[in-house]
Amino acid sequence: MTADRPALRTGDRDTRLSFGSNLSSFTDYLRGHAPELLPENRIGHRSHSTRGGDGMESGDLAPHGTTIVALTYKGGVLLAGDRRATQGNLIASRDVEKVYVTDEYSAAGIAGTAGIAIELVRLFAVELEHYEKIEGVPLTFDGKANRLASMVRGNLGAAMQGLAVVPLLVGYDLDADDESRAGRIVSYDVVGGRYEERAGYHAVGSGSLFAKSALKKIYSPDSDEETALRAAIESLYDAADDDSATGGPDLTRGIYPTAVTITQAGAVHVSEETTSELARRIVAERTEQGGSAR
């Protein structure tokens, strides 16, 4: 042993080994070294009851995101969401961003408790970037889906208090045999169960029942990107028509759904100009038809 290199103490060795074992997972590193920074640990200590101390439901205490839709099309997949967040029977926000690009070939939408969900998806994006920097290769789509499932499972304690987070993950699978069918959709339950959605479309949130009913009638797996985007916006319009927690196109304030498309070229945010034009066209057509679909 040299004089300028002191002996490694047992505690130091254990720390280094612990650090190295979870090095590729930024979430695991936070859990071991700064657990208070994880989304599920930033809500404060509350009773395990689903009611607040003043008799309010926990859903009334924090804004909730509502409806997200996803659908595959020939050569890609898209994710779209409305902009409304509710707090009990009030509109907490009219222009929440619920759709996020998480890396070059994936995106996630959020439904549930908005504050926790936004932090969770942002942490997920850091997780993917951290893994690629450490390992030198990006995670496969299945790897991404499993990582997000683990993070949702970590929020179980908050979910049992009524502060649930339900993301919707989409991505372009670079390992797919058929490039025209490489778009994939994965949904989750509040305990972290992951489910591959093979119908080609899915929706989560309070308006999901109405959105999926609309997509069932107009969805085609062979549609192009523009047709798929129109179907997504139309399904959100139908959801908003029946679900008060889902916000439809707001022509007065200029607030429209947001969307992300993912193809072999990567993930791209759809411009507001494109979504607003489609939304205005749909509203005009519905107005001519007395509010009913074509």
Curated annotation (Swiss-Prot):
It is found in: Cytoplasm. This is Proteasome subunit beta 1. Component of the proteasome core, a large protease complex with broad specificity involved in protein degradation. The R.erythropolis proteasomes are able to cleave oligopeptides after Tyr, Phe and Leu, very poorly after Arg but not after Glu. Thus, displays chymotrypsin-like activity, low trypsin-like activity but no caspase-like activity. Pathway: Protein degradation; proteasomal Pup-dependent pathway. The lineage of its organism: Bacteria, Bacillati, Actinomycetota, Actinomycetes, Mycobacteriales. Keywords: Autocatalytic cleavage, Cytoplasm, Hydrolase, Protease, Proteasome, Threonine protease, Zymogen. NCBIfam families: 20S_bact_beta. The 20S proteasome core is composed of 14 alpha and 14 beta subunits that assemble into four stacked heptameric rings, resulting in a barrel-shaped structure. The two inner rings, each composed of seven catalytic beta subunits, are sandwiched by two outer rings, each composed of seven alpha subunits. All four combinations of alpha- and beta-subunits (beta2-alpha1, beta2-alpha2, beta1-alpha2 and beta1-alpha1) yield fully assembled and proteolytically active proteasomes. The catalytic chamber with the active sites is on the inside of the barrel. It comes from Rhodococcus erythropolis (Arthrobacter picolinophilus). Its EC number is 3.4.25.1. InterPro entries: Ntn_hydrolases_N, Proteasome_sua/b, Proteasome_suB-type, PSB_actinobac. In contrast to M.tuberculosis, the propeptide is required for correct proteasome folding and assembly. The propeptide is positioned strategically at the region where it can act as an assembly-promoting factor by linking its own beta-subunit to two adjacent alpha-subunits at the same time. The keyword Transmembrane helix does not apply.
